[in-house]
C-alpha cells in the first residue's frame, strides 16, 4: 500500500490530542505504523520521505524515551532534526512560549514537536505557527503518541483491541497517558478499567466511560492488559498516599496482584519505571512485560504521525512533496 493510499482520508495537520481523532483516523495511523515496524528491523533503516524537511523538538520537560523516539523517527524518515536545548535557550531569559514559537516559525520548520508542563501549550503553538505541531505531552492533559504506541503494542501482541479488558492502574489523577489511553481504547472497542485509591482519581472520572475500582483484586480480575502508571510526585502538592510501602502493597503490580488477571495478560508501562513503587522488578523484566516492545512501537507510530500530518498539510496547500 502506498503512502498516498494510507493517508488519503486523513484530514489533520496537527496532532494535539486523541480527542480530535475519529476511529477512522486512529485506524489509519495504526495501520501505517504497523507497516513501518518491519522496516525498523532492517539494517538500512533510513527513508527519504521527509528528505529536505525540518523537524524541531521543543521539550520544556525532561524526557528520555519520547524525545529520543521523535528524533529517531524523524531521522528514519530522512528529516533534518533539531532538538532545542531549553536550558541554554532564551526561555531561561524570560522569553514566552509564543515568542519562542514565532521565532522558530521564522526558521520555516515543517514539523514542531512540543512537550510542556502547561495543558493546552501545543494547541496554543498550533495557532501561532505555519507548520505541523505534535503534542508530546502537555501537563496532565494528553499524550497522544503514547496512546497510539500502546494501542499498536496491544494490537500486535493480542491480535486485536476490540473486546479486550484493559486495566489502567496507578496515578490516574495526574496522568496525561491515562487520559489519552482512555480515549483511544474506548474508541477502539476495549473495555477500560481504572484502578487507584480515591485520592488519585480525577473528579471527572465518572464521565470518562470507564469502570472504576479501588482494589487490584477486583480491578484486575479477567484483565487482558495491565497498564501501570508511575506516581507523578513532581505534580503532587499534598499527601496523596500514606506511604510508598503501603501503596506498593495495595496498588503495585507484584506476583500476588498479578495472579488476579488472566494468565496470558500483557503488562505495559509508559516509563520511567519506579521499581518497587508501582511495579516489582521481576514483573517489569518478566515474560509478560511489553515495556521494550512499547519503545520499539513508539518509533513506528511517530514516523506514521509525521508522515500523515505533513501529507495532509501538503495536500491542503497544494505543495508538491
UniProtKB/Swiss-Prot annotation:
The keyword Transferase applies. It is an enzyme of class 2 (transferase). It catalyses: carbamoyl phosphate + L-aspartate = N-carbamoyl-L-aspartate + phosphate + H(+). The keyword Transferase applies. GO terms for cellular component: cytosol. L-aspartate binds at residues 93, 176, 230. Its EC number is 2.1.3.2. InterPro entries: Asp/Orn_carbamoyltranf_P-bd, Asp/Orn_carbamoylTrfase, Asp/Orn_carbamoylTrfase_sf, Asp_carbamoyltransf, Asp_carbamoyltransf_Asp/Orn-bd. Gene3D superfamilies: Aspartate/ornithine carbamoyltransferase (3.40.50.1370). It holds the Pfam family OTCace_N. Heterododecamer (2C3:3R2) of six catalytic PyrB chains organized as two trimers (C3), and six regulatory PyrI chains organized as three dimers (R2). Belongs to the aspartate/ornithine carbamoyltransferase superfamily. ATCase family. Catalyzes the condensation of carbamoyl phosphate and aspartate to form carbamoyl aspartate and inorganic phosphate, the committed step in the de novo pyrimidine nucleotide biosynthesis pathway. This is Aspartate carbamoyltransferase catalytic subunit.
Amino acid at each position: 500500500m502506498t503512502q498516498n493510499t494510507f493517508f488519503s482520508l486523513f484530514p489533520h495537520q496537527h496532532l494535539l490530542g486523541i480527542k480530535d481523532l475519529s476511529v477512522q483516523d486512529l485506524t489509519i495511523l495504526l495501520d501505517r505504523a504497523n507497516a513501518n515496524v518491519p522496516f525498523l528491523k532492517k539494517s538500512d533503516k533510513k527513508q527519504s520521505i521527509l528528505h529536505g524537511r525540518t523537524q524541531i523538538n521543543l521539550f520544556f520537560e525532561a524526557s528520555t524515551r519520547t524525545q529520543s523516539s521523535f528524533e529517531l523517527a524523524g531521522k528514519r524518515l530522512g528529516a533534518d532534526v533539531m532538538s532545542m536545548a531549553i536550558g541554554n535557550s532564551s526561555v531561561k531569559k524570560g522569553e514566552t512560549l509564543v515568542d519562542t514559537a514565532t521565532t522558530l516559525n521564522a526558521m520555516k520548520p515543517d514539523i514542531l514537536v512540543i512537550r510542556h508542563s502547561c495543558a493546552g501549550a501545543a494547541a496554543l503553538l498550533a495557532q501561532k505557527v505555519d507548520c505541523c505541531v505534535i503534542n508530546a505531552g502537555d501537563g496532565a492533559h494528553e499524550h497522544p503518541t503514547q496512546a497510539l504506541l500502546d494501542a499498536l503494542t496491544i494490537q500486535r501482541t493480542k491480535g486485536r483491541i476490540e473486546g479486550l479488558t484493559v486495566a489502567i492502574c496507578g496515578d490516574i489523577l495526574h496522568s496525561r497517558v491515562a487520559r489519552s489511553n482512555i480515549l483511544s481504547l474506548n474508541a477502539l472497542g476495549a473495555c477500560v478499567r481504572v484502578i487507584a485509591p480515591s485520592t488519585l482519581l480525577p473528579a471527572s472520572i465518572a464521565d470518562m466511560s470507564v469502570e472504576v475500582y479501588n482494589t487490584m483484586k477486583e480491578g484486575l480480575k479477567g484483565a487482558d492488559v495491565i497498564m501501570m502508571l508511575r506516581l507523578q510526585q513532581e505534580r503532587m502538592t499534598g499527601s496523596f498516599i500514606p506511604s510508598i510501602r503501603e501503596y506498593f502493597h495495595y496498588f503495585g503490580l507484584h506476583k500476588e496482584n498479578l495472579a488476579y488477571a488472566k494468565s496470558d495478560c500483557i503488562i505495559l508501562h509508559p516509563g520511567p519505571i519506579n521499581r518497587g513503587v508501582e511495579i516489582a522488578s521481576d514483573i517489569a523484566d518478566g515474560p509478560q512485560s511489553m515495556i521494550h516492545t512499547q519503545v520499539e512501537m513508539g518509533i513506528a507510530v511517530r514516523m506514521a504521525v509525521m508522515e500523515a500530518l505533513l501529507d495532509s498539510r501538503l495536500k491542503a496547500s497544494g505543495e508538491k512533496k
